[in-house]
């Protein structure tokens, strides 16, 4: 005999209100929404002097995200590289310590290095590479490098080799709009990695009918 519990389907919702109070005070009405299960959850109210609190929550969420496919790792690397300095200036108690962030970045670089395909690209895990995903990972490495982190240089060079020939990696069944968008993204990331290709950029613009089209 097996007993299986049947739980009440319940979830939580979060709402945010932003504004400025130069002087005086403000009253914020709170009303219980209809259809709630009063035996679950509760009401939690937090305040912050800056809208950066929402960014802190997002970075912490990505930092602790348990499912590490290459797309998710790259997204975490980008968020930490882009927001580390700003969020650290506010000394949020919810942020990991600088040493923990540094260790996390190093671990993510190692995972990406191990999972890189011999062609220089990345799949979601260790399967055949996907062109857009490869550019996304390379973009993350570029952002991290700009912030002083040290991803493996050979990994970056292999990724650049893939990006330089991105056209050959785009499947023929991709849509007409997807192909030039992917090529444009690859040119942008190559430029951030100090590998500019203005000639390819000009050709892409010309093929699209010019910048005023």
What are the residue ranges of the model-derived segments?
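Non-catalytic carbohydrate-binding regions of carbohydrate-active enzymes
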Residues: 206-213
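Extended, solvent-exposed functional surface patches
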Residues: 1-177, 183-206
């Amino acid at each position: 005999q097996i007993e299986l519990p049947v739980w009440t389907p319940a979830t939580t919702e979060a709402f945010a209100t932003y504004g400025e109070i130069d002087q005086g005070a403000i009253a914020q009405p709170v009303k219980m929404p209809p259809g709630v299960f009063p035996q679950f959850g509760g009401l939690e109210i937090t305040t912050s002097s800056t809208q950066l609190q929402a960014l802190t929550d997002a970075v912490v969420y990505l930092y602790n995200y348990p499912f590490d496919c290459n797309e998710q790792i790259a997204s975490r690397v980008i968020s930490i590289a882009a927001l580390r300095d700003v969020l650290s200036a506010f000394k949020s108690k919810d942020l990991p310590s600088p040493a923990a962030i540094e260790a996390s970045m190093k671990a993510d670089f190692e995972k990406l290095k191990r999972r890189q395909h011999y062609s220089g690209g990345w799949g979601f895990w260790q399967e055949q590479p996907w062109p857009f995903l490869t550019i996304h990972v390379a973009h993350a490495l570029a952002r991290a490098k700009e912030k002083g982190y040290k991803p493996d240089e050979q990994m970056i060079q292999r990724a650049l080799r893939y990006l330089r020939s991105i056209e050959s990696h785009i499947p023929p069944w991709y849509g007409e709009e997807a192909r030039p968008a992917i090529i444009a993204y690859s040119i942008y990331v190559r430029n951030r990695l100090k590998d500019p290709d203005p000639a390819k950029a000009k050709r892409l613009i010309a093929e699209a009918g010019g910048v005023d089209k």
